[in-house]
């Protein structure tokens, strides 16, 4: 399935979930569930295989995702949503659904979303300092999502909307390599 189609499907599911969560007053609870699920998907190759598998039956995927949701203590709305996604064979769109839902919530709150990649895990103090600096630079609320990417070797890559600042050691070394090739 082309990525554009998956994006459209993910947006539709995210819109439906957002509207249901809004009408039931559980926007934040569902957002918390989705952030937890996002972290679980990032950390567990087994869970990613279950979600992405075209071989597993709807029933097996439904049972697996239901067990995960129950163990994580997700809300009833999130549990029902995940069950519906499994029955409709749409679990493979979960990453897009989560991103779209969280984007809608941030837009509703007037927040900007920042994605930060770091070579090592940032301490809480470093995350607070980074959030403060981003708030000062972009004005207003900035929701920061920090990911660890050891391939960066050092430094940070910060993306807010369409703006990106890459101060990673990996990029600096690539620029140096290109500059050295030009000398000759």
Curated annotation (Swiss-Prot):
GO molecular function: proton-transporting ATP synthase activity, rotational mechanism
SUPFAM superfamilies xrefs: N-terminal domain of the delta subunit of the F1F0-ATP synthase
Membrane-related topology note: Peripheral membrane protein
UniProt KW keywords: ATP synthesis, Cell inner membrane, Cell membrane, CF(1), Hydrogen ion transport, Ion transport, Membrane, Transport
Transmembrane segments: none
Keyword Membrane: yes
Subcellular location: Cell inner membrane
Any one cellular-component term (Gene Ontology): proton-transporting ATP synthase complex
InterPro entries: ATP_synth_OSCP/delta_N_sf, ATPase_OSCP/d_CS, ATPase_OSCP/dsu
Lineage top rank: taxon: Bacteria
Pfam families: OSCP (PF00213)
Family: Belongs to the ATPase delta chain family.
Main function: F(1)F(0) ATP synthase produces ATP from ADP in the presence of a proton or sodium gradient. F-type ATPases consist of two structural domains, F(1) containing the extramembraneous catalytic core and F(0) containing the membrane proton channel, linked together by a central stalk and a peripheral stalk. During catalysis, ATP synthesis in the catalytic domain of F(1) is coupled via a rotary mechanism of the central stalk subunits to proton translocation. This protein is part of the stalk that links CF(0) to CF(1). It either transmits conformational changes from CF(0) to CF(1) or is implicated in proton conduction.
Subunit structure, as described in the record: F-type ATPases have 2 components, F(1) - the catalytic core - and F(0) - the membrane proton channel. F(1) has five subunits: alpha(3), beta(3), gamma(1), delta(1), epsilon(1). F(0) has three main subunits: a(1), b(2) and c(10-14). The alpha and beta chains form an alternating ring which encloses part of the gamma chain. F(1) is attached to F(0) by a central stalk formed by the gamma and epsilon chains, while a peripheral stalk is formed by the delta and b chains.
Name the UniProt record assigns to this protein: ATP synthase subunit delta
